[in-house]
């Protein structure tokens, strides 16, 4: 009985730790948002996310190359995003990275949204709408990625099936 307070304290600590571990989701990112595949990789991508938020595309690509987490869906999504948004966009490279992200994590909302936008940039409305349908299934409730791609598709259609960058 003398050890009962210590045992109860240990039990409470373990219970709280397991609740926190079960509840820990992906940390919000400056841009682009996406579910993550692992905490260590997420932390190693923080510098690249900061460069992306600052719209320093070339520097972000160099940082991502330095990290070289090719087996991480977020890394591939960020590489695709940076290549697509660069001053001289490299759409084939962006598509390769988005596809790699989706091979690793088929429901990766960021890669689904951004690859849909890439398809609009190429004038490929049917493939963009496929991505929108995939996002509709991936998002249990309306999510930002679905709403953003839906808006991009609407702008595309309203502009005579020509890509219009986000305002």
Which residues are covered by each model-predicted region?
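Structural marker of alpha-solenoid helical repeat scaffolds
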Residues: 67-70, 104, 137-141
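TPR alpha-solenoid repeat register
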Residues: 75-77, 111, 145
